[in-house]
């Protein structure tokens, strides 16, 4: 589930979809960890309740990696300022988040370990899709697609199926 976004919020008398996602062990929580779509305290709540079921996603749109300015999303003009994309009425319109930034944000904003945040971006999505036998971690017999991060969790190198890629 696309946790917190596009659904009823968590309320103590009506926990709704968020409450179900936090408590139902069958649910995977897709989380846009940019600090705009989901408040850091709400991200931390997900970690307390469902750390092993969080899947980091970006919800990135065409302005990702681009300078601030006007863009279109599904035919509607949107404005990006400071990396945050909004509609004319002020609503969020996708994100400009990268996966490595989501990993850094989880570590910085929620206190999870780098290994836990990396699993949220690699092993957990593979488990959610049922392909963790071939993807999501480095083990003999699995596909060797690897992202090398520095100590600050910034991308340094990428290998796709064992081949060094340029980026």
Curated annotation (Swiss-Prot):
Keywords: Carbohydrate metabolism, Hydrolase. It catalyses: N-acetyl-D-galactosamine 6-phosphate + H2O = D-galactosamine 6-phosphate + acetate. InterPro entries: Amidohydro-rel (IPR006680), Metal_Hydrolase (IPR032466). Signal peptide: none annotated. It comes from the Bacteria. GO terms for molecular function: N-acetylgalactosamine-6-phosphate deacetylase activity. Its EC number is 3.5.1.-. Belongs to the metallo-dependent hydrolases superfamily. NagA family. This is Putative N-acetylgalactosamine-6-phosphate deacetylase. It comes from Escherichia coli (strain K12).
């Amino acid at each position: 589930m696309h946790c917190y976004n596009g659904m009823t919020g968590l309320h103590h008398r009506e926990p709704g979809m968020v409450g179900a996602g936090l408590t139902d062990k069958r649910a995977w929580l897709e989380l846009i960890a940019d600090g705009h779509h989901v408040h850091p305290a709400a991200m931390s709540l997900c970690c307390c309740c469902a750390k092993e079921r969080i899947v980091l996603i970006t919800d990135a749109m065409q302005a990702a990696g681009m300078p601030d300015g006007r863009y279109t999303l599904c035919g509607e003009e949107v404005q990006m300022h400071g990396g945050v994309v909004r509609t004319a009425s002020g609503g969020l319109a996708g994100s400009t988040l990268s996966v490595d930034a989501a990993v850094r944000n989880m570590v910085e904003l929620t206190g999870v370990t780098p290994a836990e945040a990396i699993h949220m971006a690699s092993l957990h999505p593979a488990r959610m899709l049922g392909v963790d036998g071939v993807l999501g971690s480095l083990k003999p017999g699995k596909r060797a697609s690897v992202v090398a991060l520095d100590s600050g969790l910034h991308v340094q190198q990428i290998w796709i199926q064992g081949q060094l890629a340029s980026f």
